[in-house]
Amino acid sequence: MSRILESMLDGVKSVAILGHIRPDGDCLGSTLGLYNYLGNKYPGIHARVYLEEAAEKFAYLKGFDEIRHEPDDRVYDLCVCLDSGDMGRLGKFSCYFERARDSICLDHHVTNTRYASANLVVADASSTCEVLYGQLDEAYIDRTVAECLYTGLIHDTGVFKYSCTSAKT
């Protein structure tokens, strides 16, 4: 799988990271996984995660306390939408998508409307975290990134029991 995300990050100075309304484990795992990964590999990129408030049971994820819950007037070079099948799922944070200079959506839902400038939709993936993992340079996946990605995997696979679980998962 080509690393479209990495190519879109070239020359970018700011990234808004969005997920869906009522964030679950895959949404939080993918958004915070990407946030922490960017901090590892691209320390010069200013990244922020924007999501509705999430359950405290996910507070163990690094970056959970840094999630922004209200929109502001910032404009970003790139908006990365994760686990969101259409713009409506971005809720009140769709303003970042609309104002961004470029956009990409990574998702695993077959119903994805491919609304971003670039879209990587892998319908047979177990989770968006699995899709995201395929886009990342393993050398920059530390424990915090891995914990985020694992959270998404176990959430969307029912701890590897659901039929969406595969050998690749």
Language-model segments: residues:
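Active-site cofactor/cluster-binding pocket
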Residues: K62-A118
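Anionic-ligand anchoring segments at beta-strand to alpha-helix junctions in alpha/beta enzyme folds, i.e.
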Residues: V12-V75
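Divalent metal-coordination and catalytic microenvironments
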Residues: D24, L34, F58, V80, ...
